[in-house]
Amino acid sequence: MSKRKLIPKLSIQSPVLHTNLNVQSTHPPLKKEDLHRISKDSLESDSESLTQEIMCHSEFDDRIRGNGMEPDSLDEEESPRWGSLHEMEEEASGKAAQMAREQNHHTWDQGANNRQQPIEDKYSDLRYDPNWKSKKEEGQLLSVEALPESTDSSLENLPLAPLYPSQETSMELSGGKGEQKESPQSAASLLGSEFLSPNYEHGARRSKPFSELSDSDLEEKSSSLSPYVKSSSSHNEVFLPGSRGPRRRKSKQHFVEKNKLTLGLPTPKTDSYLQLHNKKRGESHPEQISYPVRVTDKTSIQNAKEMENAAIDPEDKWHQRAQQLKNYQEHWSQYESTKSSNVPRGQPSDMVNDHQPSRRPAKLKIRKQCKHQNGLKSSTTEEVTASQGNQNNPPRQQQNQNKPLDTSTKPESIVIMHASNNDVQASRALRSHNLKETSNTFAPPKQAFDKVLSKNSTGCDSGLNVNKERGHKDQEEKRFSYQQLHTLSDMDLNNLNELSKRHVLLSQKGSQFVYHINTHGSTKNKKQLKQPYTETKYRNLEMLWKFHSSSDSQTVRASPDSWLTQIMEQHQQALVQLTDVQPSEGALSSVTLPPILSRVESESQLSSERSQRNQVKISRSNSEGYLFQLEKGKKHKKRSSSKNTKLKGYQKRDVKLGGLGPDFESIRDKTQKLIQQKEYAKQVKEYNMKTLSILSKPQTEKTQKKSAIPRQKALEYAKTIPKPKPSNLTHQASKEQKNPTYAGKEESLPEISLLEILQNRHEREKQAVAAFKVLHIV
């Protein structure tokens, strides 16, 4: 089985192996016109890959039948379903081989003359399909069939599954390369490159149900797989966007959807906001969905309820998923608080986060090769969140055992859960940046990590549960992880700051109980648990690590209080030295910093500097030493700036200024002059006030006299003026005289001779207008 290789459809995501089904696309088989568009070289490679796929399928079926079923993965009642699935797989592989032979035969006969023939029906999706309901039900049944065979296999596939199965249906063997090449090439040649995107090609590959199965077989298969829908498929529906409901066909249809948008026709939303955001990001991290591996019965019940809400809009689905993520976080926090008091924790929480996605494929390959070489069965569970020395223990045994190796896996799984939940919002924008940094920082320790994994793989082959052997391996892994903490980037440490503080305290409490049971590795664990606690407390400053010496990476034998005080001193030294001193990176480990002045000394230093400035200002008032004091101040500034750049100058900052003090006599003279000026000003003020008061009195008297004289004159003149006589009678008489003259004039006016002429003319015109109206001319 060493020839078999797992080939993912999306290179970014981790592989997933579905051993039960050979999935075919929902589109009808490629026609002759499409096949002529493919070159002869690709057809030869396709035929060879199909033969290899058939051989791999036959070997895989023989191996499964020879080994039988594993007791942990399948029950005895599922044997008929297992056989029916194998029959379906054989029939599907036979049909695929027959189809490929016919395609090769037609293409070699007809040649490349018909390469530019169009597709017969491009607008099939716009026409009414009477069988739409049956196709919808078949798509739902296939999503049920594509699930893992058991809860253990779901545990194996969940951490490795891609985040968005709408773009990727399943993993195929290396023989299936040819089928994957044909459909995108034909679609691209017909529609053009402008209508095809990388997401479009992957979205076009959909799984369809087997047409040779009857309705009764499909019903039996759905009923037999119903218990696993509640346990594992509901998790995919909740945490994997785009997995619920039948998937729409996207191939050969993008230009039609574009026309629908231009015409204003309503089109259903195929992608939710979360899917579009992650497509732009272009990355998928499997550890974000690995935390529900240890989900209890409550979570399975909650996930089973999601099957009823499969027909909700994508936006509502997104809101429901966000709410359930919050519920899972609360549930796991309660689970963690209950388990921390009962179950000892022997491993720090930062150890899991050291395993970055860049090293995860190597880890998985080593484990899979280990299992294939020793003849283990394919349906065994591979828990990514578990530690390397505890692969063979199921999750149920970990709750009831007090061994340090078994209990060490629990903080790891909880840490992964919190990291995925807390970083859903914050870490998406930082993922690309973190990957670039971690790929450079983790390059040297990768070889040592592979060595540790090889030791652990041999340990899982032997199957021994001896505490001594596993204790040594765990200690080696812990040492490696602690050395790795120094190479972590600052962004990753900030994301896990609050989480690691909480779990390191719990791990220290749990480790005290573990030491009574396993006395072999008690002393080493105590030394190793102190270091991540202190490191997580000061990880936010990246310069802190630069000022650590090479001896800090080793285990410390001092008490935790002395270790904390030592790190606090180093931290303060780093903060103070960063303002003035920036040594080279090569001499970081050998630089010894000077002692820091205490707060009292720094305050006295500030007060002395202020007094020096005041003295300079006061001495500037003297005309004799003004220029001398300026030059002296400039020299002092130059000396202080030059001394700050060196460590020796930093130590000798408190400098005493020499020279003459302030001239007190000149100050006294100035004060006396100021006092005399004030007194003179007061005297002048008093004199002016007196003079103003004397001048103002006669002026007021004169003004009063002047104002009284003209008033009296006016009153006297008014008395002499005679009163006017009333003139009412004269006005009335004059009016009476005028009115009769006006009336006589009106009576004496001659009559207008033209008035009668105008009246006659008006009547004539009226008659003419009436005649026009009768004739309907007007």
From Swiss-Prot:
Region annotation (Disordered) ranges: 62-271, 334-408, 631-654, 721-746
User: One Pfam annotation, family name?
Assistant: JHY
Keywords annotated in UniProt: Cilium biogenesis/degradation
Q: Which domain of life is it from?
A: Eukaryota
Question: What's a single GO BP term from this record?
Answer: establishment of localization in cell
Polar residues: compositionally biased ranges? 334-344, 375-389
User: From start to end residue, where is composition biased (Basic residues)?
Assistant: 358-371, 633-650
List, as start-end ranges, the regions of compositional bias called Low complexity.
223-234, 390-402
Give TM regions.
Answer: none
Q: What does this protein do?
A: Required for the normal development of cilia in brain ependymal cells lining the ventricular surfaces.
Name this polypeptide is given: Jhy protein homolog
Organism from which the protein derives: Homo sapiens (Human)
Traced from the root, the source organism's taxonomic lineage reads: Eukaryota, Metazoa, Chordata, Craniata, Vertebrata
